[in-house]
Amino acid sequence: MVIKLSFHVCSHILNYFCSYISGYKNRFQNFIKHLREMGDEVIVVTNHEGVPQEFHGAKVIGSWSFPCPLYGKVPLSLALSPRIISEVAKFKPDIIHASSPGIMVFGALAIAKLLSVPLVMSYHTHVPVYIPRYTFSWLVEPMWQVIRFLHRAADLTLVPSVAIIKDFETAHVISANRIRLWNKGVDSASFHPRFRSHEMRVRLSDSEPDKPLIIHVGRFGREKNLDFLKMVMDRLPGVRIAFVGDGPYRTELEKMFEGMPAVFTGMMQGEELSQAYASGDVFVMPSESETLGQVVLESMSSGVPVVAVRAGGIPDIIPGDAEGRTSFLFAPGDLDDCVGKIRLLLTDDEFRGDMGRTARAEMEKRDWRAASKTIRNEFYSSAIDYWRKKQADIVQPLQWLAQMFMPAPNRVIGGGIKQ
């Protein structure tokens, strides 16, 4: 194992500071904050939109970007200009950490190879699942080929859930010894039951705070299966729902819920977001393709029970032994089970309160700092070890060939006899 008092880490992260809503953006921001607190030097390469000069003491380098053709609010950038290569070279990183998949990861790969630096890739968006919903199903296998190419070129891959590890094994992406699970963390101080607010509940309920209130927080995309919530609400008369967030599917969603007891607040941040979480009764997560499920963690940390699909990375947050104690899961597409569990929580205040407190206690164990320490002290060191072994595997055959075909220099031994 390689032990260092201080790493020089270069992070290539798309959509790091822009208005695009995502759990992985929040995850990286918390991760870099903790790296800086542990004394590591960090530079961040990201798209140019809304980029500050620094973040918690980490220098931020913006790269020219352009809108994604299929998802206009997502900026894309290769981050491979001479300026960026020069900045990274001057920084002399011990490791490059890139988010995958995306265009920027190709730039990170090129720079890592050019500068001969170990490369860690963390996989955050399960694109093969989304492709059929946005384009054509026949593109799924080519996407897997791209993923194989990228992650086989990396020294270590981090994934957000056990489900993704299984998918990678099934698709023969990389060997199991080069995959690690990036444990989920939550800011339990910022997402706390103490932020429950009557004023916020009035706002979320359209001035009907005494009505049962379902809350959903996140990015509104077609792939999030938000249509399912319409069917849920059709089965729950007298119940209100609040949507907190934004995204390309918002306009269609507002039309879908027109005339229904629904409120769309738009994006919230900071204490306002903390109040929104804590002021609901039940959080419902219908998405079947969540790799991370950060909003589920934040709701449970706020003391609000969750009813979520048993899919993707959610069972890592609510495992079998915790189901029914910290929150509920339902099978994909099982409307009856979902509605039944929501109804139970909304009609039994004591049970809902107990579950919320148990969820909160569980989330207090999921500390961002502990997860960040594991990556820094264990995963980065494993990547560096693997990279060094790979370098040695390349150099040793070359040395052997040199010894075979190049004559050794004459050496003088003993009393001057040449050998």
Residue spans of the language-model regions?
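N-terminal subdomain of nucleotide-sugar transferases
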Residues: 1-64, 368-369, 390-419
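Short alpha-helical donor nucleotide-sugar binding micro-motif in glycosyltransferases
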Residues: 88, 267-268, 275-280
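Nucleotide-sugar donor phosphate/pyrophosphate-binding loop at the beta->alpha transition
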Residues: 118-120, 129-149
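Carbohydrate-associated surface elements
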Residues: 163, 185
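Aromatic "clamp/platform" in nucleotide-sugar-dependent glycosyltransferases that forms part
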Residues: 269, 288
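Short hydrophobic beta-strand element within catalytic cores of glycosyltransferases
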Residues: 305-308, 318
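Conserved acidic donor-binding segment of nucleotide-sugar-dependent glycosyltransferases
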Residues: 320-335, 344-349
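A short, well-ordered alpha-helix in the C-terminal region of glycosyltransferases
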Residues: 337, 344, 351-365
